[in-house]
Structures are given as structure tokens and as C-alpha cells.
Amino acid sequence: MIVKICGLKKAVDVAAAVDNGADMIGFVFAKSKRQVTVEKAHELAKNIPANVKKVGVFVNPTEEELMAAIKGVPLDIVQLHGQEPAKQANRTDAEVIKAFPVKDGKIPTNINDYPNAYILLDAPAEEYEGGSGKTFDWDKINRDMLTKNKLIIAGGLNAQNVQEAIKRFEPYAVDISSGVETNGEKDPEKIKCFIKTAKGVE
């Protein structure tokens, strides 16, 4: 199972994720309590080996902002968490994850407008997009609409429920942020526990 640890701001947290087998490291450039600058992400990225993909999280960015981060960090993947047009997701300079909020079990109808992107399903936003710590209603999802080899599950995951999520959705990857935090800060022990638990289900 591919595991993405998102919202990292400190070298110690990046090390905990990398050392325990994370496959993707997420840096949040959108307005958030987990926001980092391109310069900070560049410094943190120096400690990430080439086989671990660096992901930048954005909400309705300009093309200039995307390109600056892709080159400046550098990023392997951009994660679009807003209402970005399909043409912005159709790019060659980075892979793309397109996030969709799932409300009342309904998958947005425009999910098929992004055929080349990984599709990330998340809980509905609160103050900021993503990182709410809440799950969406797993029971109501029509899984026939989903392409498993492009599917990423996020929203309220933790070491206690990730195995259930993997069994239900058989996704390409799982994505976590607040579920590996204690008092709003990343917790290296929770990072380790989550990765080990997620990768125990194949």
C-alpha cells in the first residue's frame, strides 16, 4: 500500500515519515495551519530520497505558483484541492492528484473530467481544504464510479481505521495528515504506527 504523509513542516517529521517507509511526502502551500513556503519545502526536500515522491498541495493556484513550486522544491506531484480547471491538471511537468470532497456519500460528477490524475476522496472542507480529521461516509459511496489504480483515500484516517478503509476501497494509496498529530503537531510515533499498519494490509 502506498502511503502519503501530508502537512509536514519539520525535518524531524520528514525523517520519521521517510525512515518508516512513507512513499509520498506532502507539503501544503495553500492557506492552512500546516502551510510552508517553497523555500522551506526546498530545505526539507533535501532530506527526502529520490524514491519518495514530493507532493505540493494547492487550492486554486495560479499557473505561476504551480510552476514556481514544481521547480523550486522540486515537486514530483501537485495535489489540487480546489476548483481547478481540468486543463491545469493536464500537465507534463508533474503528476497530478485531484482532490474531491465527498458530501453525503456523493462523488462529484466532474470526477471524470480529470482522466490523467489520481483521484483523492476527502471529507468536506471546514475552514481550510483538507486536514479536517473527519471521515466521509464510506457506506454511501458508489465504488463502481472509482478506478482503483488511481484512487487515493483521505479524510479522518488513523492507525485504527486505515485497514478498514483499504479493505473497502482497495485504493492505490492512503493519505493522512491530522491522524498522525498530537495537539496539532506531527507525532513521529503516530507516523510510524500509521505507516506500519497501512502497509500490513496488501
From Swiss-Prot:
Reaction(s) catalysed (UniProt annotation): N-(5-phospho-beta-D-ribosyl)anthranilate = 1-(2-carboxyphenylamino)-1-deoxy-D-ribulose 5-phosphate
Tagged with keyword Magnesium: no
InterPro entries: Aldolase_TIM, PRAI_dom, RibuloseP-bd_barrel, TrpF_fam
Group of enzyme by EC: isomerase
Gene Ontology MF term list: phosphoribosylanthranilate isomerase activity
EC number of this enzyme: 5.3.1.24
Pathway assigned to this chain's UniProt record: Amino-acid biosynthesis; L-tryptophan biosynthesis; L-tryptophan from chorismate: step 3/5
UniProtKB keywords: Amino-acid biosynthesis, Aromatic amino acid biosynthesis, Isomerase, Tryptophan biosynthesis
UniProt superkingdom: Bacteria
Annotated transmembrane regions: none
GO BP, one annotated term: L-tryptophan biosynthetic process
Family: Belongs to the TrpF family.
Listed HAMAP family: PRAI (MF_00135)
NCBIfam families named in the record: PRK01222.1-7 (NF002300)
Protein name, per record: N-(5'-phosphoribosyl)anthranilate isomerase
Organism: Listeria monocytogenes serotype 4a (strain HCC23)
Encoding gene (name): trpF
